[in-house]
UniProtKB/Swiss-Prot annotation:
Function per UniProt: Catalyzes the oxidation of either pyridoxine 5'-phosphate (PNP) or pyridoxamine 5'-phosphate (PMP) into pyridoxal 5'-phosphate (PLP).
Annotated binding of FMN, by residue: 55-60, 70-71, 76-77, 99, 134-135, 179, 189
The protein's annotated pathway: Cofactor metabolism; pyridoxal 5'-phosphate salvage; pyridoxal 5'-phosphate from pyridoxamine 5'-phosphate: step 1/1; Cofactor metabolism; pyridoxal 5'-phosphate salvage; pyridoxal 5'-phosphate from pyridoxine 5'-phosphate: step 1/1
PROSITE patterns, A to Z: PYRIDOX_OXIDASE
Keywords: Flavoprotein, FMN, Oxidoreductase, Pyridoxine biosynthesis
Protein name: Pyridoxine/pyridoxamine 5'-phosphate oxidase
Cofactor binding, per record: Binds 1 FMN per subunit.
HAMAP family named among the record's database cross-references: PdxH
Family under the similarity heading: Belongs to the pyridoxamine 5'-phosphate oxidase family.
Length: 206
């Protein structure tokens, strides 16, 4: 991470007590500084063999309960999140010299939440959720396009319902770390650990 680092210091007495509120304020700054996909994050899951896998997805919602993303539950990340319900998230906002890491348990969002978000998506994305056998082998692009055409024909002139295999996951955090770049690699790191229904804060060596 090579970047021009502005002077910044957040002493322990200044650490906000609520990591979700701190994330919200930082996320607003990221949206002002980054034109494309400031909500992009790396999601890491783990398979039956203990091998981790990671990919970039988009954060779609967050609140005190956790951080939400949507996907095909038969995709690799969907299968792994259901079988081993823990995940790690990582946001990196280079213009801000900021990184946020989130770790926690994974739970499925409610059907009402998934339905509401699915209906807000562009129709092409709704069709794609039916047509794509996400993470499965694909012989040719034409095969995918044929499946898209089939779904478009099936739902022509009517709303596209949410597929039963498509929903959201909420990562319920028990650890959130904020990192701010400093000169000489002497970065600021503050971790929040969930304890007894609240949060304990701790500074970390860089």
């Amino acid at each position: 991470m090579h970047t021009c680092r502005a002077p910044f210091m957040l002493h322990r007495v200044m650490i906000p007590p609520d990591p979700i509120q701190r994330f919200a304020e930082l996320f607003e700054r990221a949206k002002q500084a980054i034109a494309v996909d400031p909500n992009a994050m790396v999601v890491a899951t783990v398979g039956d063999d203990g091998r981790p896998s990671a990919r970039v997805v988009l954060l779609k919602d967050f609140d005190a309960r956790g951080f939400v993303f949507y996907t095909n539950h038969e995709s690799r990340k969907g299968r792994e999140a259901r079988a081993h319900p823990y995940a790690a998230l990582c946001f990196y906002w280079q213009p801000l010299n900021e990184q946020v890491r989130v770790e926690g348990r994974v739970e499925r969002v409610t059907d009402a939440e998934a339905d509401a978000y699915f209906q807000s998506r562009a129709r092409g994305s709704q069709v794609g959720a039916w047509a794509s056998l996400q993470s499965q082998p694909l012989a040719t692009r034409e095969e995918l396009e044929a499946r898209v055409a089939e779904v478009e024909q099936k739902y022509a002139g009517q709303p596209v319902p949410r597929p039963p295999h498509w929903s959201g996951f909420r990562v319920v955090p028990d650890r959130i770390e904020f990192w701010h770049a400093q000169e000489s690699r002497l970065h600021d790191r503050h971790v929040y650990l969930r304890e007894d229904g609240g949060w304990r804060t701790q500074m970390l060596y860089p």
